[in-house]
Amino acid sequence: MKREGVSAFIVPSTDPHAGEYIPERWKARRWISGFTGSAGTAVVTLKEAALWTDSRYFIQAAKQLEGTEFVLMKEKVEGTPTIAEWLGSVLPQESVVAIDGWVNTASEVESMEISLKSHNLQLRTDLDPFAEIWEDRPSVPKGKAFIQGLEYAGE
């Protein structure tokens, strides 16, 4: 991150297709934090790390993050900062926060840009540090695409 001029990296629980069940290759949040729940976002700075998840996973996350550098952030609990608020409090102004733009929708990127900008932070969308640091990262799935029959389509 330091070499790239990045002060923080946000790691969501998504893949390039915004699928509900994501292939192993894109489970970077699980790999970096150890948290295996299906919903959560990890944020890693040069000095600190935190994981946001919802109430379904508070107990699981607390157990799995125990003994790690990650602090559990309980989403939508009074007093818990948003990711942008937290980053605004731990990073110098004008710091660069990065994401892998391939695993975020355009509306997510726009929302992140707005919230980070309100804390005087910049967003970079072209970084995938896991390509370099996750040595045994699973490969891209090689299954063939196929057309679903109309009988499976909604109205």
Give residue spans per PLM region:
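N-terminal accessory/capping or targeting/presequence segment of soluble
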Residues: M1-P92, V96, D100, N104-E155
